[in-house]
């Protein structure tokens, strides 16, 4: 049946290198997928302002995706957390579900609650599997060491059910190791959650996270919000925090793409703002 792809707002705009690298990696691995249409934001940015608006947007998105009858691939930790949380609310609150469906009915939509959705890291780990990925590696990263940054919402909060273990998240770490690299896990926040209300504090946290990875070959991420804070805002984070090192920041889909034979442009490393040229140079391409 294949999959339906919902990149999310941030990956389709600000962090376009994530979407581009994910699409080219999926194609290279012969994953059958198509883009979802008539979709909207997951609504999570609205949660603290209008919780009903948030619930409605996530419910609408799920109802549209349900219509494809296929499992859905998500790129964003926030989208995955939002859909998981709202699904739990709607499945447990019949009155809330009825209210949502009364609004969706105006568009001929209905929330059923049977959408199967996975973060792309889950898809790579569970559906494709480590062995198949390892067999596709053309040039590994032996001799490299990476700092692993799954992102807060990939494994928290555990009361709504997250893709990875909330105490010892391992999926992204394992996926990096099959490429031949050493890896160390870091669970510190990138600073996004406070960035929009206190930019300096957010950038300080991002800079602190970069400093923790200063003795590695780079930070491997799987969340577009981490990409904004540590890659797009790299220079600002270094300036505000006083960090003076050089730490490439890239998505796992970009790292995997290089390992399976894609070019730096195929995985859109030209769109990264952190010093990824250091990584490309050491990799020798």
Annotate each predicted stretch with a short phrase.
Residues 1-285:
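Iron-sulfur cluster-binding electron-transfer modules in prokaryotic oxidoreductases
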